């Protein structure tokens, strides 16, 4: 019995250390009325090695409106993901002052926080960033990379109601948009955003979640993590100059039907019959499979 209790205690201590003790904060002063001092919560990935020659990527996580970031930076799900991929997590604690508009003040604050973090961890990559957000945070997770596309690699936005104006400047920044289909107003806005990008010949990965209102279904988080991990690994050259740049597929190989959640070969008869507004194109089977699996989750 004592052995069992000791084991349970060790597991609790290890879990607490893994997700709570690895976090810290950076404070940045701004001129924004309600944000004279902004706290940026960050998390160091497990087994961080300061002597490593290749660099560590950054994931910027924007929580819901006016979040303190304290819960997000200690997320077990995202903590596990960051440890697995060797990624630093940074979560802002913006409040009002139109913080989702990076060109006004919040973008500069984020870049200053990254610079400070880099002083402590010199092998952090301040380039080719990853972004994730939901609700008001989803606005940030697409507006921020649109503000600095040259410093961005990929973004995922869930339940978003405000998007950047589609631009060819974003053609090398990969995007994932998800939304509950019961979140009707945002769903319509999402469809319009994706269609505007399609007119520019730029593919945005898309998934709706049936019967979900303005919430965060686990399937959307799973898909976001699979999506960001895919591009994080595909573009390992961002972090190590000795790794060759990947050959990018110019033609999608699968097409998904957002209504029935199934995928088909792009040139198959069924694939060709999918309505334009329900079509989701995939350039890799890995992402196509993750898209299908996400629909089976609560």
Give, region by region, the residue ranges found by the protein language model.
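Bacterial Sec-dependent N-terminal signal peptides
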Residues: 1-22
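A domain-start/cap signature at the N-terminus of enzymes
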Residues: 18-57, 105, 132-142, 269-271, ...
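Gly/Ser-rich "nucleophile elbow"/oxyanion-hole loop immediately N-terminal to the catalytic nucleophile
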Residues: 46-55, 100-136, 146-149
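Short substrate-entry loop that stabilizes the transition state in hydrolases
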Residues: 48-101, 184-187
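The feature captures the conserved acid-bearing segment of alpha/beta-hydrolase catalytic domains
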Residues: 50, 153-228
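Loop/turn elements at helix/coil->beta-strand transitions in domains of secreted/extracellular proteins
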Residues: 54-58, 84-90, 125-130, 148-154, ...
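Cell-envelope and extracellular/periplasmic
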Residues: 61-66, 118, 134, 141, ...
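Alpha/beta-hydrolase-fold serine-hydrolase catalytic core, especially in secreted/extracellular enzymes
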Residues: 200-202, 210-298
């Amino acid at each position: 019995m004592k052995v069992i209790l000791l084991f349970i205690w060790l597991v609790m201590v290890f879990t607490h250390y893994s997700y709570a003790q690895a976090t810290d904060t950076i404070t940045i002063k701004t001129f924004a009325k309600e944000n004279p001092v902004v706290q940026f919560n960050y998390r160091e990935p497990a087994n961080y090695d300061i002597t490593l020659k290749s660099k560590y990527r950054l994931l910027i996580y924007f929580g819901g409106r006016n979040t303190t970031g304290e819960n997000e930076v200690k997320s077990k799900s995202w903590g596990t993901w960051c440890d697995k991929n060797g990624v630093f997590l940074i979560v802002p604690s913006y409040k009002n002052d139109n913080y989702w508009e990076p060109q006004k003040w919040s973008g500069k604050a984020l870049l200053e926080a990254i610079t400070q973090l880099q002083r402590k961890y010199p092998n952090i990559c301040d380039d080719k960033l990853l972004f994730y957000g939901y609700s008001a945070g989803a606005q940030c997770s697409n507006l921020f990379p649109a503000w600095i596309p040259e410093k961005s690699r990929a973004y995922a936005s869930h339940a978003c109601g405000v998007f950047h104006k589609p631009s060819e400047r974003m053609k090398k920044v990969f995007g994932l948009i998800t939304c509950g289909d019961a979140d009707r107003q945002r769903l319509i806005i999402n469809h319009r955003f994706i269609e505007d990008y399609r007119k520019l010949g730029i593919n945005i990965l898309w998934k709706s979640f049936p019967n979900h209102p303005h919430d965060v279904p686990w399937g959307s988080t799973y898909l976001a993590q699979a999506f960001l991990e895919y591009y994080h690994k595909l573009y390992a050259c961002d972090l190590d100059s000795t790794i060759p740049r990947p050959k990018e597929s110019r033609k999608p190989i699968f097409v998904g039907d957002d209504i029935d959640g199934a995928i088909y070969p792009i040139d198959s008869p069924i694939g060709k019959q999918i309505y334009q507004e329900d079509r989701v194109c995939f350039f890799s089977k890995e992402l196509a499979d993750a898209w299908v699996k996400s629909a089976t989750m609560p």
